[in-house]
Amino acid sequence: MQDIQLDKRLSELLSQAVTPHNAQPIMQALCQSLNEHNIRYYVDDAPSITDSEYDRLMQRLKQLEAEYPQFVAADSPTQRVGGMALAKFEQITHLKPMLSLDNAFDEADFSAFHKRVSDRVGEVSFCCEPKLDGLAVSILYRNGVLERAATRGDGTVGEDITENVKTIKSIPLKLRGDNYPELVEVRGEAFMPKAAFEALNERARLKDEKLFVNPRNAAAGSLRQLDSKITASRALSFYAYALGVVEPTSHELAKTHYEQLQQLKSWGLPVSSEIKVCDELSQVFAYYQDILTRRADLPFEIDGVVMKVNDIAQQQTLGFVAKSPRWAIAYKFPAQEEMTLLEGVDFQVGRTGAVTPVARLKPVFVGGVTVSNATLHNADEIARLGVMVGDTVIIRRAGDVIPQIVAIVPERRPEDAKAIAFPQHCPVCGSLVERLEGEAVARCSGGLFCEAQRKEAIKHFASRKALDIDGMGDKIVEQLIDKELVQSPADLFKLTASMMTMLDRMGIKSATNLALAIEAAKTTTLPRFLYALGIREVGETTAANLATHFGSLEALRVATIEQLIQVEDIGEVVAQHVAHFFAQPHNLEVIDALIAAGVNWPAIAAPSADEQPLKGQTWVLTGTLNQLNRNDAKAQLQALGAKVAGSVSKNTDCLVAGEAAGSKLAKAQELGVKVIGEDELLALLAANS
């Protein structure tokens, strides 16, 4: 093995005869060397040994691991081949939400974003990077060792894909060096390079198997395999693009986004070589045009570029909106377009009641797929386009995912073209379709009655924060509706144990317990009942405010928009939603049926000032509470008049910090917000009980 270019220590170890006494240090040295060569190859782009030399080292390690399996290390490169297949993916709650980005589609959009940012924080530089078309991934390292990995999911909860991520050769199983934090979350994009995608489809073609449409679908499908051996065979890659949670928070990190990416690279994580800092708006546009021009020649698929405010302090000042950071934007590339014929328009009703026009198209191949349907969004979009049935239209796959009509070809309009009439009544249930002033989306107002909304309405009605029917999970609701045992929330209270034994995996004992839970749920509170009705934009707090203000369901049912606007935190839009909901006869019939079935609640007495000592205050909960669950603590604080928010700001009056409190505690301390522990909270609640 004298031809292998190794460090002196490894050379000395490999020259020894292997025994049970020295096998472990030899294997550790091999792991360390192979992992370092992986980083040099995938991260530094500067390999120091040949592929054949690497293969010989790997083969030697495999031989030793076969002889001494008790010494196999968790970070051994041999562990990337995949393990036992899973039955399903476990759910993981992200330590910090994985937010999505707002989009810019042209220079005007980005200029507006730039103005919003610079108006708030002054001059800014941007860290610009290609927007990889793959799957967002969170990877958690503890003491430098890869502990877990998860998909983005809905941003709050993702799927545990740890074993699959370990098969990606460019992701280190152990970080390089020793200057990393005790706990560090790395966020990035898992993707399939174009060459790997072509090879994968070629193998499928030879086996007469179904081909993947594009590299993104291939990457997503590969990463979500229950059998990690399949993932290991798919040649996925990864680029890190951000830090997530870092603990301890006192660990010194770079002050700019670009420098933080270089820190990630120094720890052995791959970072795109196309990243660049731009100080001027003109440089940003030049970067965009450069990447767009070279798009086809890049080794991976991209659908735009991402621009992030480079200064971390400015990022923190800008903060976040509900689902995205204010300091970053995805500047999307123009999607591919084709012309085809609009043959008709159908109207679909979604689970939330949104009535959406769907274009039926003469099938056309665009953006890598055959498209026969496209969204027309809403009535405003139909009017803006001036589109009619029979028109020749231009189809674009917006964001390379959702086909949409972007224009018509007027000169090709036939004489018999027909105008598109938006329905006045729901095509599913016949209820009035409402469209409030200032809103683009039209909605069916028969929320409790409409078949299209039925499953979601009843799931919500039975949920923990609504009627709280213990044991009535989503799967049971779906079965009840599919078997036509339930058609409205009131039908839940007609169910008997014997009826529910018809459900899958529902024995008489479980059915009896569920019947008892349904009976118990009849006694509730007016705020819970109002929340359970699923009125648009009426959450727990708004439901409580409505109940407190009007005192009874009877008074609320006949309230005018003017009266509703007088309720705390209710504006004209929410007032219109409430008024329209109670104006629908179908909804009133369901409410009357619920009351006739025995649903009841105690009368509400208006709280005195003494009973609401926290009125006007904003509180935030963070960390783990041992004696109260989060919802109970929230409800009790609200009963004392507090508004319970989800994030800390300068308007926060008090933060309750449980165990393992993280970024919210740090933010509160930074802003000088009062912080109390669980014991102090319990004392406060006891004193006001």
From Swiss-Prot:
Organism annotation: Shewanella sp. (strain ANA-3)
SS bond list: none
GO MF annotations, alphabetized: DNA binding; DNA ligase (NAD+) activity; metal ion binding
Function field: DNA ligase that catalyzes the formation of phosphodiester linkages between 5'-phosphoryl and 3'-hydroxyl groups in double-stranded DNA using NAD as a coenzyme and as the energy source for the reaction. It is essential for DNA replication and repair of damaged DNA.
Name this protein carries in UniProt: DNA ligase
Assigned protein family: Belongs to the NAD-dependent DNA ligase family. LigA subfamily.
Alphabetical UniProt keywords: DNA damage, DNA repair, DNA replication, Ligase, Magnesium, Manganese, Metal-binding, NAD, Zinc
Upper classification of the organism: Bacteria, Pseudomonadati, Pseudomonadota, Gammaproteobacteria, Alteromonadales
The keyword Zinc is annotated on this UniProt entry: yes
